[in-house]
Every structure is written in structure tokens, then in C-alpha cells.
């Protein structure tokens, strides 16, 4: 492979000149002689010059420095060697536990599986979170999005799902921290170690691999770190395993793409996003899929800028998901956590042919009651409860009980709530909401339903209140 030399360096964008007959291909990785820095080719400008993005700090780069073409895209370690380890976008370990002794590597750029290789599943994945299991159930091998603005609980919900699914799940998990806080990555690692999902003594016995590209890193790292995590998940899937793939946060992937696009001088599109937003998102999401060999179940946190679900970034993500869990600031302000909006959240699995008629009817009854309560709230605010018809008063009382029963203490929030976390089976969830909807519990006060697990706990709590 021919060497090139730097001809221009503006921030994270580095132009490199090569002999005209030896120009690198798009996405080829370039290495700097005597340095750890990697550049990734983004554009061919002609005359032997390629425009690259630095995957690391570009401090100290000068014109004339020698750059080596590797001839291949970025490759990262895959397989059991990655378990229990924290790696960066290039697959280098950042957990101070020595090198990753891998037997094989894989390119982070690859095509999505062909249509005839796909294997969609209709099996349900129980999460133990009442509101999710009832109104937006997850599918094994499906894609789930947790949508929410700043501070409504996306990361806490993600941690609880990891706690409930990954710990009980016999398969493997891959966690990609994309442009999130370093503190959260650190907390996650220690939490996994405490739960024995990460085995510090013998990392090969761990069940999770972690890839981090944090907020403070250059845009190139944040743009590619999701692909690094996905490549590791795909390798486990292709070995015939069932993999959980967690991404926190997919919006930062879009944002990094916007930064890179601006640095490369592309004309922005709506709201300043990159013109290639749909294509970049599609290329990532189409690879997160289950094949006849194994499955990838993906759970992605999606930040919603200014709580606007019509923003191009969350709107583009919506199209690729099987289940959407929408977190609402209005519900959080009532003190109801998880702050999932049961009227906005959707799932393709909520179909009587998939979940069964009993589950479907219960979920629709709950949504219908809450929708009617939402319509009556304006009348209550202006005229008061006394002006409502008797049947509407009864409906409002049931809706308020349902709303409170949708709250639940989380295991990961025990530290700051002081209440022990609860895992509620789907059978108990359906039973509880059926009893409220049928009017069996009309005599109990609504406070009894707040922050409990099963309906039996609510009945016990009501006795104590009386």
C-alpha cells in the first residue's frame, strides 16, 4: 500500500494526498506513522486527494506528515474475547485490564443480511415492567425505542430493562454507549459487576461486552461507535446465539453525523440535519436484525429534542422500530414512574393473534378508559368533578387508579427511592388491570395503587391506609 501525506488539517477534517494510481477507497482506515491516530476516508476529492475524519484528537498534526493506507475499513475484535471488557470505537480496551486477546476481527462496515436470510419472530419478551408488558409488548428479535426528552428517565428505564432482561437472559448482551456521559458508563460497568453479569476475575465468563464513545470524544468516534457495538453483536448472532443489543443514545449517533456532515461541507437539510440522515439511520438499523442463525433484540434510547416527536431525528428512527415506548414529561410531573405514556406508546405485537384475546382486550380497555379521562380533564378543570355524569365520575375514578397502578418501583432506583424494586409477571399485570377495569376494586382508595407491584400489594396497602 502506498503512503500519503497530509495537505490540509481543519479540526477533525484531514485531507491526505496519495499517488493518483493508489487512492484509498471510501471508508478505508488510514494510520499515522508512529502514532495511534486512525483516519477514515469520507470523500475522494480528485487529484489523488482524499478527505478524512480523525477518530481521535487531531492535536499536533502538520502538513507533510506521512499517512499509511491500511487498504481495509476499521476492524475490531469480535467473539468471546470481548466479553466483560470495555472498548473504544477501534476495539482498543479502555478498562485497564490488559489487551483484548482476540482470535478474529471483523470490519465495522458490512451489508445488512439478505431478505431471504431474515427470520422475524412473534415470541414475546417479558420485561417485568407493567406498562410496557401491557400496552407495548416487546418481541424477541425485535427493535424497541425508548423516546423521551431530557430528564424523563430514558437511562433509568434502559438500566431496569437490562436488570430484568439481561440478568435473567441466558444469552449475551452488547452495550453501546454513544455520546453519553462518562459517569453513566462507569455506573453501568460497576452495576453489571455487582450483578455478576461482568465477571471481574474471569472476564470470559461475563455475559456483556461494552463499547463506549463518550460525549467528550470527537464526532468521528461517536458516529462509528454504534457500528463497532453492532459488529460485535452480529458476530455473536452469526455464531447462533441470541443477543441483546442496547444503544444509549441513538440521537447522539444522528448528532455526530450532523457534525461530520457540516465538517465535510455538505449543505444541511431540515433543522440543520445532514442530507443523508435517512440513509445513515437505515444503514445502521437494517443491520440490527434476526437471521435464521441467531437473533438480535435491540433496545435503543432516543433523545427527543425539546420534547418534539416530529423532529427529523426521532421521526426517522420511528420507521424502523417494532415497539415504541414514549416517556412523557406530563406523567413524570405527576410523580408516576416509569413515565411511559400508555396512549402514545405502540407495539406491532399488540395484536390478538400474537398476545391473545385476553391481553389485547385488557390493554385496549385500559387505553380507552385513560383516553376518555384525558378528554374529560378540561371539563373537570373548568367546572369541577360535581358537574360530571355519574358514569363519568366512575370512569374518572377508575382511570386515576389505572394511572397510579402503571407506576412501579424499579430495582435500579432503590438507592434513591428507598423502595425495593418489583418484577411483575405478565399474568399478574393483566389480572390487576382486569380487576380495576371491571370495577371489582372501586371501593379502594387511589393512593393504594401508587408504586406497588401486583394487585395483591395494592389491596394490602389499602388495608393499611384504612
Curated annotation (Swiss-Prot):
Alphabetized UniProt keyword annotations: ATP synthesis, ATP-binding, Cell inner membrane, Cell membrane, CF(1), Hydrogen ion transport, Ion transport, Membrane, Nucleotide-binding, Translocase, Transport
Location within or outside the cell: Cell inner membrane
EC numbers for this chain: 7.1.2.2
The UniProt record lists the keyword Ion transport: yes
Coiled coil stretches, renumbered: none
Keyword hit for Oxidoreductase: no
Pfam family, one: ATP-synt_VA_C
Broad class of the protein's primary localization: membrane
Purpose of the protein: Produces ATP from ADP in the presence of a proton gradient across the membrane. The catalytic sites are hosted primarily by the beta subunits.
Protein name in the entry: ATP synthase subunit beta
Annotated source species: Janthinobacterium sp. (strain Marseille)
Organism lineage: Bacteria, Pseudomonadati, Pseudomonadota, Betaproteobacteria, Burkholderiales
